[in-house]
Every structure is written in C-alpha cells, then in structure tokens.
Amino acid sequence: VAIFGGSFNPPGLHHQRIAAELTRYFDRVIVVPCGLRPDKASVDEVTIEHRKAMVNLAFGGMSGVVVDTHDLDQGVYTRTYDLQAMFQDKFPNAVIWHVVGGDIVSGGRAELSEIHTRWYRGPEMWQEFNFAVVMRPGYQVEAGDMPACSQSVELDHLFGSGTMIRNLLKEGQSVTEWVCPKVEAYLLEQQLYR
C-alpha cells in the first residue's frame, strides 16, 4: 500500500501522473490530503471543502487509487509517523510505503535530509519505514542518500507544482496544461487562488 500524502493545493496533472505510476508498483495507492498545517500557510488559502472537492475530482476515478480525506473531515493534521500506525491498523497484512520526492531525502547520508531534520521522529522513520522516492527529471539522488528501505519511482517529463499553479491563477493566467479539466473548471467556477 502506497500512502501518497500532500497538500494537493491544488492537485495538478503532475500529482495524477505520480499516482498513476504508483499503481504499477503497488496494489493500492491511497491519496491523503493533509489537514491544516502550522508550518505550511498555503494550505489555508482555500477552505477544506474546496481542497476535498478538488482532490476527489482529480483522483476519484483513477483505477487503483483511493482518496482518504480523514484529515480534512476531522480538521486535523496527521504526521507521517502517525499515518503509518493508522494505515497499518486498517491494512494489518499490508506493507505500508510512504511516497516522497527526491528532494525530501537529499542529504540523507549525512542525516541532513528533510526527513531527518524536520519530520517528527524522522531519524527513526528513516531507518524503519518504507519510502517510495519519486525522482523528477533532472533531479538525481545519490544511492547513499536514500532511506534504509526505499524504492525509486522514476518519472520522465514530470513538471508542475502547486505553488506554480497557484501563482498562475493569481496572475489570471491559464492552468489548462497543469490541471485536469474537472479541476480547472472547479478552480474557475469557484474563483480560487485569485
């Protein structure tokens, strides 16, 4: 089971590509939009209801992908460490993998990765959890920087970010090439990130 957590603020085509690719590696991909985070003010830019609607529009019909909106429904933020226990309880016979970007593990050899330095119980997770590391084009992670139990997920031509999409919307520019049609229609109808 792959846990694909993130703010998905908004969910872009790059997120959908990652989820689709993960279905080739894992039996089930669970998209987990995070709740409000004290360390990420951009998550507060739109309501939880809008984020939930967009995540369901983006991932709802994807084969092998399910959306878990626990954090959004409960108005909480569940740390990765706690997600492990939550999903291990839901799927006691499954091996749980956490999806992260290569930038998050960079510096791992020297214990300087974001997981080591910023995540709750990061050094422990680094040694004990399974990580599926998504490699963006042009961004290579040295083998020594990878977590103890990890698997690389290589994606060619993966471009886009939530920040970029939000900035385009703020500037009144088109996001047609960065989000799926359903999400784009929702963004425009609701006039989000303007």
Show where each model-derived region lies.
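Nucleotidyltransferase catalytic core that binds NTPs
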Residues: V1-R194
